[in-house]
Amino acid sequence: MSANTGYTIFETFVGAGGSHIGFIQENFRTVYVNDFIDDCLKTLVYNNPNLIEEGAYIDNTSIDKIDAVALRNKLGVTIGEIDVFFGGVVCKGFSLAGERNPIDERNYLYHAQLNLVNVFRPKISIIENVPGMRNAKVLVGDDEDLRSEIEKLWQALENYKGKKAALRKINKINKAFEDEGKTLKKRKELLLKRLQNSPNYISVVEDIKRLYEEMGYTVHMDVLNSAWYGAATKRSEE
């Protein structure tokens, strides 16, 4: 089925198309979809052959490697022509599960998304993520010593988790090992307290809002539950 609404959609972090299917069902015409995982794109195209029929550009370039101006020229669209930009930016670093590394490279991918928005200037731009994004912060600036300290500590935490899982299987966790974990946890707490007092430790949501407003967009933020829109699960997204 070909799109017939006249509206266009440009989506990044498309995955296998969980969000994109909504636009297809509403007969949006897909101009561009991006994900760096080939199998995701193959699944998306297999389930939606109309994407090829309509000439959608299927791109597996990592979003932080995209030349936005060159892409706009390749697509042959003008500034402000695209109706909707949608990006479910990677959420691993913002999820309430896990260690939430403050310098996780994935935490900064929204900058690449907003660079695309700045170059294309769509009529509507949507960034979707987990509710944990509301409390997420990232470290900016060039304090290499602090970054190195964070990287080493978070690597030690990951190594400890892996070793703990292995020892649990053979019932070999002892008090000394548990004390090591408590020490790492305390070091993490102290480091996070230091970060909270740093002017370079900034709110992700406030940074996104600032960047949008600098481009002239009016920003609305809310947490939506997928069950409100017919999904079989009660899953909240921002």
What are these regions (language model features)?
Residues 9, 33, 86, 126-127:
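Generic enzyme active-site microenvironment
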Residues 11, 35-37, 62, 128, ...:
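Acidic active-site catalytic centers that drive phospho-/nucleotidyl reactions
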Residues 45-77:
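S-adenosyl-L-methionine
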Residues 26-28, 52, 85, 118-121:
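Short, solvent-exposed loop/edge-beta patches enriched in aromatic
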Residues 2-58:
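Conserved S-adenosyl-L-methionine
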Residues 69-82, 89-237:
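Class I S-adenosyl-L-methionine
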Residues 14, 38, 65, 91, ...:
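Short, glycine/acidic-enriched loop or turn micro-motifs at the edges of active sites
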Residues 13-16, 85-86, 130:
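Short glycine/serine/threonine-biased micro-segments
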